[in-house]
A protein has these predicted regions:
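Short hydrophobic segments within beta-strands
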Residues: 3-4, 76, 103, 122
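The feature captures the conserved acid-bearing segment of alpha/beta-hydrolase catalytic domains
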Residues: 98-160
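Primarily recognizes the serine-hydrolase "nucleophile elbow" in alpha/beta-hydrolase
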Residues: 63-117
Length: 181
């Protein structure tokens, strides 16, 4: 499983740590990728030119895991990491994955017809407005992708603060149901 963090942070920050560590303890091999970052206070739009670099990092991560014999590769991404993963999935080349968990994705899925794997769109009831306002469009975009779904977690904010165990439980349920052991 590849983990992609959000903007302005590192591969073990915030909710990434419990995802990476708890899912590893529960049998998932995890690879947390350092995504391209700008200063923490930089808003999302200046990140757009970095998306090709992010896609290359994800491509290399997929190739690394496949090269080491892993099957059933998923990407679990948060926030800006989800936007970068969406870009990657629009330009997959030979780096096919088997499932994608997009946590706190703002805006819409771009070109979901290019997605070849089930998508789990997971967000909090108290998430950012950009995430909440586009939830219906995201649900409609993945409706035709077999095995995909969307879930709003009651009480959760964008970072699942204080609800990390619930986040891990939901992600694990999806991965367990979509990836072959």
């Amino acid at each position: 499983m590849i983990v992609a963090h959000g903007r302005g942070v590192h591969p073990d920050a915030g909710l990434i740590n419990p995802l990476r560590s708890q899912l590893s303890e529960q049998g998932y091999a995890t690879l947390s990728v350092q995504m391209p970052v700008l200063a923490a206070e930089v808003p999302g739009e200046p990140y757009l030119p970095l998306f090709p670099e992010a896609a290359e990092r994800l491509r290399v991560a997929v190739a690394f895991l496949r090269g080491n014999g892993l099957k059933g590769i998923a990407i679990v991404s948060h926030s800006m990491g989800s936007r970068m993963t969406n870009y990657f999935l629009n330009h997959p080349g030979d780096a096919r994955i088997d499932a994608w968990v997009a946590i706190g994705l703002s805006g819409e899925f771009t070109d979901p017809a290019t997605f070849k794997a089930p998508v789990f769109d997971l967000y909090g009831e108290r998430d950012y407005a950009a995430v909440l306002d586009s939830a219906a469009k995201r649900a409609a975009a993945i409706r035709s992708i077999r095995g995909s779904g969307q879930m709003q977690v009651a009480g959760a904010d964008h970072f699942f603060a204080g609800m990390e165990n619930e986040l891990v439980r939901r992600v694990k349920q999806f991965l367990d149901s979509r990836l072959q052991p």
